[in-house]
Amino acid sequence: MKKRGFGVGKWNGFGGKVDDEHGEKVIDAAIREIGEETESENGQIGVILLPGDLNKVAEIDFRFEQKPEWSQKVHVFLAYNWQGQPNESEEMRPQWYDISEIPYEDMWVDDEYWLPRVLSGEKITALFEFNENQELLGYKIDSSDFPQIKLK
């Protein structure tokens, strides 16, 4: 559960911004963000990932025409190997769910359109358009040229 910032009160994956100013790569930002967001408030180390642990499964453009500063391109990764466990942090309260019990009603409305596809092994590119009230106006999802992943 997102505890602060954009999307507060919604179940969401770990993530954040790429430090373009210092030449950070997307995969390095993903590794850094999950480390930061799974470290407990008292400094207990959470999840540790290596670049080979991540499989890129989606690139999604989120557009907010009336609030362009909210628009963002999101790179989605799945990990099947990691060290440590996620801890509650100032930003996130993690929770594991069976795929059949994912609480889409408590997530961003777009998640129910793309997340089942990537969890089934498909890799996608997508565009979601929202209004200033965060209501979905339209979307497009395409299978990508990324190679298909093999779920364990």
What spans do the regions from the language model cover?
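Unchanged
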Residues: V18-G52, I60-V118, G138-K152
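A general secondary-structure junction signal
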Residues: A58-I60, E132
